[in-house]
């Protein structure tokens, strides 16, 4: 279910403050807020999004606006399905 338009996009307050202050900075903004939506003000900024283990740097571009930060930092690693161990010999 989508968020109501009258409520507007959700962005954590601490992340919004960091984005405002890091307008021309090259240093990535470290955040644990995967639920925050990407706003047009964030375009061109590198945000390091936590995936549960470490921070994944995400360079925000205009195609990402409207999506959430967590969509670009994968939390699960697929190692492959189990195969027949005898065929490897």
Curated annotation (Swiss-Prot):
Protein S19 forms a complex with S13 that binds strongly to the 16S ribosomal RNA. One of its GO terms (molecular function) is rRNA binding. Belongs to the universal ribosomal protein uS19 family. The keyword Cell membrane does not apply. GO terms for cellular component: cytoplasm; small ribosomal subunit. One of its GO terms (biological process) is ribosomal small subunit assembly. InterPro entries: Ribosomal_uS19, Ribosomal_uS19_bac-type, Ribosomal_uS19_CS, Ribosomal_uS19_SF. NCBIfam families: rpsS_bact. Keywords: Ribonucleoprotein, Ribosomal protein, RNA-binding, rRNA-binding. Pfam families: Ribosomal_S19. This is Small ribosomal subunit protein uS19. It comes from Xanthomonas euvesicatoria pv. vesicatoria (strain 85-10). The keyword Ribosomal protein applies. The gene is rpsS.
